[in-house]
């Protein structure tokens, strides 16, 4: 596992200021900055406990989760909408329904089509946070964030959401309603685009005997997971791309850390990229000394954490080819949060097929948990991946990298799902920040836990960070 001494940077105050200044300077050029937000996921998992309550034998909130939901119901940003929905679907407001013990009618009004339909909508369109002027969805919080750290020289903010076909129109409608007011509020111009996961990235499902899974005789193809989005990322016209999950947002009053550390990791990225570009120009010129080659090798090993024990056996001419190949790749800087027992992937130093050791984000499904030593290493990791990335996707000559070439095809994995109650094995493509970016130059930077506030269940919205 990578740690502060090994592969994770923890910049001091002086370095921090230098990186923040580097980002501010970069933003004032003509470079294209895009904020990329995967937003196609349905929110159904957020409401798993409430769906269970609807089908339970009992009618009163019984589990801790159910009780917490009803105790805090007035604190949800969707409370007013839900009140109206209850009057429409059940003829009474929330206090009235709760008083007569009809708790299920309240939950039904939240989740079902006749009510707010939250059980079928994507997370990006649900009301998360209350403000004096009305409640905000994650989509709106990402627009606000974009204005705070991703605005270009002319005040233009590019935000790209990946959405599912069925929800695209709802996203567009919300943007049409809100973008102008947000632009005025933050003094920026929004340029908002959408794309969908490409159907040709779907994968075939298998049954438990590894035979093709059939649904009424037809082969079943399923979306291949977030790794499919490397294609969407590849289609963007951008120099720098920020990537962050749709549900990891906080209200404006708590955004300061998020904004500072986003700028910080972007500053680390553009500083490293500048250096790599200078070295590539030097290698191209052919006018370099043996000392300079050694300096570039040190940069690759010490600052980009990419090592190969074989380099000491290479002649200068071979070393130059090796250095050019390694430096001329897409680059990403990923924020890493101290481990507090959250599930999810973590930062590791990993061997690649060409014998180099580099930084990778590995998921538990990529690690053999039956091997006690490997399991312990995974669980003892000091940091985990909150999905907080900044990516540089052009080469030193200004051409776009073809990101598909940098995917490690061998890192796909199998997950277990079901269809109509039947178990199946699903083939997931290499994860977007895992195998899909395996052959990138990767650097990790420690960021505070305050930048990581995901909403995995509806009751997470009752946490102080979301109030």
State the predicted function of each range:
Residues 1, 147-153, 378-380, 434-435:
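Short, flexible, solvent-exposed loop/turn segments with mixed acidic/basic and small polar residues
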Residues 156, 330, 343, 384-386, ...:
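A general secondary-structure signal for short beta-strands and their flanking turns/coil
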Residues 143-147, 371-375, 429:
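Short amphipathic beta-strand starts and helix->beta connectors
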Residues 241, 351-386, 395, 411-416:
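C-terminal, active-site-flanking charged/polar segments
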Residues 94-100, 118, 247, 262-301, ...:
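Conserved catalytic alpha/beta cores of large enzymes that bind or transform nucleotide phosphates
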Residues 3-340, 349-361, 365-366, 455:
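Domain-scale recognition of functional cores that engage charged ligands
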């Amino acid at each position: 596992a990578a740690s502060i001494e090994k592969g994770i940077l923890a910049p001091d105050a002086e370095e921090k200021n230098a990186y923040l200044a580097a980002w501010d300077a970069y933003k004032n050029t003509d470079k294209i900055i895009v904020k990329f937000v995967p937003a196609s996921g349905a929110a159904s998992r957020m409401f798993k406990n409430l769906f269970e309550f609807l089908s339970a034998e009992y009618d009163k909130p019984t589990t801790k989760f159910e009780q917490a939901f009803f105790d805090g119901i007035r604190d949800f940003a969707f409370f007013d909408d839900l009140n109206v929905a209850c009057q429409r679907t059940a003829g009474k407001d929330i206090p009235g329904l709760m008083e007569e013990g009809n708790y299920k009618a309240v939950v039904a009004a939240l989740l079902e089509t006749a009510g707010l339909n939250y059980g079928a909508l994507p997370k990006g369109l649900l009301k998360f946070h209350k403000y004096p002027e009305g409640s905000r969805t994650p989509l709106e919080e990402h627009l606000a964030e974009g204005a705070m750290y991703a605005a270009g020289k002319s005040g233009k903010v590019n935000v790209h959401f990946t959405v599912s076909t069925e929800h695209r129109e709802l996203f567009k409608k919300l943007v049409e309603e809100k973008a102008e007011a947000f632009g005025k509020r933050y003094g920026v111009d929004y340029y908002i685009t959408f794309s969908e996961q490409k159907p040709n990235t779907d994968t075939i499902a298998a049954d438990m005997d590894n035979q093709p899974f059939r649904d009424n005789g037809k082969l079943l193809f399923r979306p291949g997971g977030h790794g499919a989005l490397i294609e969407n990322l590849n289609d963007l016209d951008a120099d720098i791309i920020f990537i962050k999950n749709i549900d990891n947002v906080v209200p404006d009053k708590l955004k300061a850390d998020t904004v500072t550390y986003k700028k910080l990791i972007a500053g680390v990225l553009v500083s490293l990229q500048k250096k790599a570009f200078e070295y590539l120009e030097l290698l191209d010129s052919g006018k370099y000394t043996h000392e300079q080659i050694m300096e570039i090798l040190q940069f690759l090993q010490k600052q980009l954490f990419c090592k190969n024990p074989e380099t000491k056996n290479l002649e200068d001419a071979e070393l130059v080819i090796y250095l050019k190949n390694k430096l001329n790749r897409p680059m990403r800087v990923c924020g890493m949060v101290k481990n507090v027992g959250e599930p999810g992937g973590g930062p590791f130093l990993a061997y690649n097929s060409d014998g180099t050791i580099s930084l990778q984000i590995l998921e538990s499904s990529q690690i053999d948990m039956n091997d006690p030593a490997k399991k312990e290493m995974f669980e003892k990791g000091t940091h985990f991946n909150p999905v907080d990335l900044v990516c540089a996707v052009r080469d030193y000559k200004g051409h776009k990298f073809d990101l598909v070439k940098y995917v490690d095809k061998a890192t796909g994995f199998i997950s277990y799902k079901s269809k109509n109650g039947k178990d199946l094995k699903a083939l997931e493509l290499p994860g977007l920040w895992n195998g899909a970016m395996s052959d990138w130059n990767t650097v990790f930077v420690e960021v505070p836990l305050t930048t990581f506030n995901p909403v995995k269940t509806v009751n997470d919205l009752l946490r102080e960070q979301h109030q």
